[in-house]
Amino acid sequence: MAKKDTTPMMKQYYEIKEQYPDAFLFYRVGDFYELFEDDAIKGAQILELTLTHRSNKTKNPIPMAGVPHLAVDTYVNTLVEKGYKVALCEQLEDPKKAKGMVKRGIIQLITPGTMMQERPDQAKDSNYLTSVISTNSGFGLAYSDLSTGETFSTHLADFEAVANELLSLQTREVVYNGHLTDLNKDFLKKANITVSEPVEVEGEHAEISYVAQNLTDDAEIKATKQLVAYLLSTQKRSLAHLQVAQSYEPTQYLQMSHTVQTNLELIKSAKTSKKMGSLFWLLDKTSTAMGGRLLKSWIERPLLSVTEITRRQEMVQALLDDYFTREKVIDSLKGVYDLERLTGRIAFGSVNAREMLQLAHSLGAIPEILNALLETNNPHLQNFAKQIDPLKGIHDLIVNTIVDNPPLPTTEGGLIREGVSEQLDRYRDAMNNGKKWLSEMESHEREVTGINNLKVGYNKVFGYYIEVTNSNKSKVPTDRYTRKQTLTNAERYITPDLKEHEALILEAEAKSTGLEYDLFVKLREDVKKYIPALQKLAKQIASLDVLTNFATVSEQNNYVRPNFVTDKQEINVVNGRHPVVEQVMTAGSYIPNDVKMDQDTNIFLITGPNMSGKSTYMRQMALIAIMAQIGSFVPADSATLPIFDQIFTRIGAADDLISGQSTFMVEMSEANDALQHATKRSLVLFDEIGRGTATYDGMALAGAIVKYLHDKVGAKALFATHYHELTDLDQTLKHLKNIHVGATEENGKLIFLHKILPGPADQSYGIHVAQLAGLPHKVLREATTMLKRLEKQGASELQPASEQLDLFVPEEASAPAISDDEKDVLDEIQNVYLADKTPLQVMELVAQWQQELKDKD
């Protein structure tokens, strides 16, 4: 960086900037944070700031832009959300007391993975910083949400597994110690993940050993220590709220790749990337932010343990059966703030008095929740309540210390209740007496001078003063008043008495404000001792929130409690419904369908027209399984399910983010993933496998995949296809059954029944679907002609191998010569649906056709 200004302040700036070249340096100057040089130019553009210059009189003025210190969080968040890092450089001493240049230093490096200030619409989102260690045995991965302190670790075999985990976590930043290939770099760039280098921290830090204390895997230990070291380095403070890392194996949960989660729209709509339209959107009626985050994590990691699932189900059933208790709990939960993140801010030292009261109010709601649960006769609700410590002592400590409506700043006084500190009360008495004296002085001076609008005021530059308008200057007693400031319409004066009392008042105010801040810090440190207890309470309340939410959603949507079979792989879902689709349809219009697969049936081969509901039926099965394994009730009349260990999907056409593969290559890769890793306890959904290549290649591949699933894998599979030739496989594959989505034709129009029926579909209705999509009549007519020719010529095995199936031969010579325009009119006549037309409308149509034929002559 070219150093254009070597004044002491800018010299200090350059020295600090050299330490953080990849970050925006927010440099505190008075009430502003300033950006200089390239930071100012780029920052002004991104943040829409006015770009000015320092040292304008020199040949090379320095670009400069600033933001008020009270609004800095907004600007920092904007930069960090765009993937940048921000170094906050603060004044480390009172400028009034500084000898020479004010000491400054970085108090925090804010990065995409360490941002704690979320927007209101992000309250139910986690922000994970992830650490990855490359070892000879694979990769150690650890991640933490700094705002809550929760920390997890695992060991993964290869970078593809790491990439999948990063995408599933929606991590914003990864600390990585290894070499990145160009392919890996490309993936991280496409995924908008910031890559940061590991750092080493000097000295011993209790947090590092504390967080990793329960880990046994060497790669996980290294990844976790690397994670905590990076957090300590960037945050530059104690991080007492970081929780002991929980080690997990992906195989502990129902495994679903990021692609599967995307295809099934678990967290976001695949079309809009928004919450609306996803399973999370449907199920999320939680009352607290921490409940919403927990629900999301449950959806992403369904359980495998029937015991754990049943424990959740029992709570949901109890809350579903007891409406009044449930409503009491919900009402009380609405008064609970984000305990997890409040606890994090307390540990972080950034909590203010209002947030401290939010913690107290949240704790105040806990006894109401416990009473509601304990007053029931249900042992599950009672036992849950008995495990909760309401932490009444913390609640009482806060409400007895902080005033009811404290100001936002913690350094300007007005925080602490009267009676908390005798010394503080004495300072306040002195302040009050001084202000009383000022009021009396103002009245006295008005009386003795005859200036009725004389007033006593205060500002930070001159202190207390007496202000007199210009029209009354002649009445000023010059022997006692000393002029201090001239304004446009008034003069300001001081007197010896005023300055004497000013010193007393300001001294009392300064001491009072300082003592209040000290008392607030003491309160914060006292509460900090209870961080583990607060974190445990937060998890319990979040869990109750999710389970109560399940009961509410189940009641609203008429869900049923699923049963599980563990000794055999059987599915028996009666009148199952797609939970999201039914919500966006008119009430009662959704057509439910059964899924019944006994021990002798592993594969459903599904045929039927496009748009008829094959994909919906398949997704419906997967979502019901996921809902069941997170402890939710499910959309069906009844449901008996096995415990699935993995779900694989090949649904939709999208290129691959991780490797940049084409759609067909992605299709084959995902099919291979299922064929290689699925077990008899897995659920496989394949939709239109083989459509990305030539017809016979695709048909051959699809048939071979079905056979491999049947003979080698043995998983429960729903296989939708447009290759009707595959329906003959039920003759040789005894565990395969044909089903189809019903459709019928009425007056030349295709009617979807959306009902699953036994056996294969008799035709595909592809041209009818194209008609529904609005394709031109000429295209539809040409397609119909080709279809008839194909049906007449038959399949390829009836022709010599060297002969191409000629679709584009001319019409038979005997066909009457009809122009294309005339054919268009004939098509309109053939396709018009007369049943919904009045006689007058029919007459108008006939007249229109007659005119069209005349115009074409």
UniProtKB/Swiss-Prot annotation:
GO biological process, one term: mismatch repair
Organism lineage: Bacteria, Bacillati, Bacillota, Bacilli, Lactobacillales
GO cellular component: cytosol
Residues reported in the UniProt entry to bind ATP: 608-615
Taxonomy, superkingdom: Bacteria
Main function: This protein is involved in the repair of mismatches in DNA. It is possible that it carries out the mismatch recognition step. This protein has a weak ATPase activity.
Keyword Electron transport: no
Name of protein: DNA mismatch repair protein MutS
UniProt-listed NCBIfam families: mutS1, PRK05399.1
GO molecular function: ATP binding; ATP-dependent DNA damage sensor activity; damaged DNA binding; mismatched DNA binding
Family: Belongs to the DNA mismatch repair MutS family.
UniProt keyword annotations, A-Z: ATP-binding, DNA damage, DNA repair, DNA-binding, Nucleotide-binding
